[in-house]
From Swiss-Prot:
Species assigned in the record: Escherichia coli O157:H7
GO terms for cellular component: cytoplasm
Keyword line: Porphyrin biosynthesis, Transferase
NCBIfam families cross-referenced by the UniProt entry: hemC
Annotated function: Tetrapolymerization of the monopyrrole PBG into the hydroxymethylbilane pre-uroporphyrinogen in several discrete steps.
Miscellaneous comment in the UniProt entry for this protein: The porphobilinogen subunits are added to the dipyrromethane group.
Pathway per the UniProt entry: Porphyrin-containing compound metabolism; protoporphyrin-IX biosynthesis; coproporphyrinogen-III from 5-aminolevulinate: step 2/4
Cofactor dependence: dipyrromethane
Subunit structure: Monomer.
Protein name, UniProt field: Porphobilinogen deaminase
CDD domains the record matches: PBP2_EcHMBS_like
Highest taxon listed in the record's lineage: Bacteria
EC annotation from Swiss-Prot or TrEMBL: 2.5.1.61
Recorded family membership: Belongs to the HMBS family.
Amino acid sequence: MLDNVLRIATRQSPLALWQAHYVKDKLMASHPGLVVELVPMVTRGDVILDTPLAKVGGKGLFVKELEVALLENRADIAVHSMKDVPVEFPQGLGLVTICEREDPRDAFVSNNYDSLDALPAGSIVGTSSLRRQCQLAERRPDLIIRSLRGNVGTRLSKLDNGEYDAIILAVAGLKRLGLESRIRAALPPEISLPAVGQGAVGIECRLDDTRTRELLAALNHHETALRVTAERAMNTRLEGGCQVPIGSYAELIDGEIWLRALVGAPDGSQIIRGERRGAPQDAEQMGISLAEELLNNGAREILAEVYNGDAPA
């Protein structure tokens, strides 16, 4: 392969392509003369649209095909939405760069109502996420929550067609696609704790590819990486994928990491919450110890049910 060419494996959804172009532009700005090519591909998660993610099962629904391209040397890096990245990587691959985080909050989107609390009883709310579902159901048990799959444009069309009274999407995705005007309210973490890594873009590559790792170093955002490290450590201990009722959000405040997390029964009947504060260098250990606390406080039983009896040890 030519020394001045770098190939990016990406999904073909508008949001995935935005992320790939974002990384491409950053790389070319940092390394004049570098030629960056996109290698678009379709993942299993893109194809299975008629089934809720939690029922499809498996981890890495949106990344596996991209990882195969890396292993077969058809691409040099894969660009992912961090909330889709599994906790484990195929041998020889790893997450080497996390870019600066966009707003990680969930967005309340509706054509008729200004806020979640303004929805009348019996309103239909669309979301594809068990994490969002359990928090919505806890706060508003009088709402009807229905599955909503597809890319951002598809989901907005279903709302506009009247299938839903409101839908919940990620603020980051809407902003990146130039659809910020559709956001009626950004939900604070106290109402909807974000997904692990939500709003951050991660870059995966072959661990022995020194040249590519050196090119990517300039794109790593230290604060975002610290925060996502704490969130992912917790998720790893919980054996969480991208379709489980787990929320985790870390902030860096006055030089200290504040990590909040939850595990919820999908129907909102029970949500186990916890938090930790500590030094940035302890980010990983904080995540693990918070996960242990959640497991001991009832999360193990909730996850066993979601995972069909296969609970974290």
